[in-house]
Curated annotation (Swiss-Prot):
The modification Blocked amino end (Ser) is found at S2. Belongs to the PCP4 family. This is Calmodulin regulator protein PCP4. The keyword Methyltransferase does not apply. It comes from the Eukaryota. It comes from Rattus norvegicus (Rat). Restricted to the nervous system. Expressed throughout the brain, in particular forebrain regions, including the granular layer of the olfactory bulb, and pyriform cortex. Also expressed in the hippocampus, caudate putamen and the cerebellum, where it is associated predominantly with Purkinje cells. Residues 1-39 are annotated as: Disordered. Functions as a modulator of calcium-binding by calmodulin. Thereby, regulates calmodulin activity and the different processes it controls. For instance, may play a role in neuronal differentiation through activation of calmodulin-dependent kinase signaling pathways. One of its GO terms (biological process) is osteoblast differentiation. GO terms for cellular component: axon; cytoplasm; neurofilament; protein-containing complex. Binds to both calcium-free and calcium-bound calmodulin. The affinity for the calcium-bound form is 50-fold greater. Keywords: Calcium, Calmodulin-binding. Residues 39-62 form the IQ domain.
Length: 62
């Protein structure tokens, strides 16, 4: 789980993000083995959380 925290994700409060507006953003390429068991487990977990979110969102709008 520590890999997730150190992945460089920000919460929108980063003051230096505006400094790079003039620079071209380079997209990182990831080589992810889509057949790996841990990748499948991660995908299922993400989908499950997304479905819960959608269900909660739909329930609050009614």
């Amino acid at each position: 789980m520590s890999e997730r925290q150190s992945a460089g994700a920000t919460n929108g409060k980063d003051k230096t993000s505006g400094d790079n507006d003039g620079q071209k953003k380079v997209q990182e390429e990831f080589d992810i083995d889509m057949d790996a068991p841990e990748t499948e487990r991660a995908a299922v977990a993400i989908q499950s959380q997304f479905r819960k979110f959608q269900k909660k969102k739909a329930g609050s709008q009614s």
